[in-house]
Amino acid sequence: MTRASLNKQPHEVASMFDHVAERYDLTNAVLSLGQDRAWRKAVARAVDARPAQKVLDLAAGTATSSLPFARTGAYVVPCDFSQGMLQVGKERHSWLPFTAGDATRLPFKDDVFDAVTISFGLRNVQDTDAALREMYRVTRPGGRVVICEFSHPTWAPFRTVYTEYLMRALPPVARAVSSNPDAYVYLAESIRAWPDQPALAGRLGRAGWSRVAWRNLTGGVVTLHRGFKAS
């Protein structure tokens, strides 16, 4: 089986996602207890894509996260660095312009997109700050970023229960439904090591984003961070 280490070497992370691509969406639905749909809807509302706007969906995987933007009439570009995920996505949604790309070295010109979004992917990037700067670079002045990521529950008793779920319950569930359960051990470990809500907001600000704010979902299990590029 394949899993990445917490130093997040790009080739390790890409290989890990190559191995889970076929059953990735199903596994996410099971492990999130069905909450993934509600989280995607919250992302779509926060991005607020409009007809003819250009939206970059980073770490888009199979493009499940891209579809809500396409339905608004926006031009959405699903971008990922896992060839396995891109291949599955192309088989399912051949009409979308799938693009291979590393979040720290995006293959796009400056000031192109009205919105850039990344769901459950920033945590897997080796250099978070470089990725935030690249998102800023490719966003047009006045545009926005929306980041959806696992975070830290705000209520201490629930935080304890959630940590137990990550470390004890999640691995056996993953073994039952995933093609690469070891990847979900990495998932649990990377969530625990991820910065909390204020810390990530600070990093967005240092990357250039203004009016940074966040909203907790499911008690802080997931958090939406949003920022804007000054006009």
Curated annotation (Swiss-Prot):
Catalytic activity: a 2-demethylmenaquinol + S-adenosyl-L-methionine = a menaquinol + S-adenosyl-L-homocysteine + H(+)
Enzyme class: transferase
UniProt keyword list: Menaquinone biosynthesis, Methyltransferase, S-adenosyl-L-methionine, Transferase
Keyword hit for Methyltransferase: yes
Species, as recorded: Streptomyces coelicolor (strain ATCC BAA-471 / A3(2) / M145)
Positions annotated to bind S-adenosyl-L-methionine: T62, D80, D102, A103, S119
Role description: Methyltransferase required for the conversion of demethylmenaquinol (DMKH2) to menaquinol (MKH2).
GO terms, biological process: menaquinone biosynthetic process; methylation
One MF annotation (Gene Ontology) recorded for this entry: demethylmenaquinone methyltransferase activity
Disulfide cross-links: none
Official protein name in the record: Demethylmenaquinone methyltransferase
Family indicated by similarity: Belongs to the class I-like SAM-binding methyltransferase superfamily. MenG/UbiE family.
Domain of life the protein comes from: Bacteria
InterPro entries reported for this sequence: SAM-dependent_MTases_sf, UbiE/COQ5_MeTrFase, UbiE/COQ5_MeTrFase_CS
Pathway note: Quinol/quinone metabolism; menaquinone biosynthesis; menaquinol from 1,4-dihydroxy-2-naphthoate: step 2/2
The protein's Enzyme Commission number: 2.1.1.163
